[in-house]
Amino acid sequence: MEPDFWHARWQTKQIQGFHEGKANAFLVKHFPRLPVAPGARVFVPLCGKTRDIAWLLGEGFRVAGAELSRIAVEELFAELGVVPEVTTQGAHTRFSAPGLDIFQGDIFALTPDTLGPVDAVWDRAALVALPKDMRARYAPHLVALTDTAPQLLVCFEYDQPLLAGPPFSVPPEETRTLYGADYVVAAIDTAPVPGGLKGQCEAVEHVWLLERA
């Protein structure tokens, strides 16, 4: 999956299945399970312009995000009503405001030194955005990037041949394979997707709590 795919998606606003108009219900319900307190820094990979960031900031957390599309990052700050400071940091463009840093560029080129320390990860739309071969690269990269910070992870599961993706189906056994060596992987919630995924096929969402092994 090439970067041009996602740039085109944002240019044409084809972000169904990823962007929600309000904070994710699983985030609101389960974020207190993570061992972090207000003031902690939360990493949101492949963040787009998610409203989850506004919710996290409103709860007193600091947020770092990574996003490929400059359009998405600019729309995020516009919707937050914040004018960012824009600088170049390593291979990325950094958009900064009080309590918020978004690194625009390839997440696989993001380094721990550039990102800085984080205390937790909220992954609702990153792992599922990637095809299987890229998920096998992404998971260990995220673990190294965040120094095995605890994660709250949401994955779709559906009959993959019925829908090309993204978002892709990530069945529970794959989640355990990807993260089981580094984390205690606990399933904490599951729910059907109302109306099906993109209205095309039945799907469920699985919520996982990943804590250091």
Swiss-Prot record:
Catalyses which reaction(s): S-adenosyl-L-methionine + a thiopurine = S-adenosyl-L-homocysteine + a thiopurine S-methylether
UniProt-annotated binding residues for S-adenosyl-L-methionine: 10, 46, 67, 124
EC numbers, comma separated: 2.1.1.67
GO biological process, one term: methylation
SUPFAM superfamilies: S-adenosyl-L-methionine-dependent methyltransferases (SSF53335)
CC annotations in GO: cytoplasm
Signal peptide span: none
Assigned keywords, A-Z: Cytoplasm, Methyltransferase, S-adenosyl-L-methionine, Transferase
InterPro entries, per database record: SAM-dependent_MTases_sf, Thiopur_S-MeTfrase_Se/Te_detox, Thiopurine_S-MeTrfase, TPMT
Gene3D superfamilies from the UniProt entry: Vaccinia Virus protein VP39
Subcellular location: Cytoplasm
GO molecular function: thiopurine S-methyltransferase activity
Family: Belongs to the class I-like SAM-binding methyltransferase superfamily. TPMT family.
Protein name, per record: Thiopurine S-methyltransferase
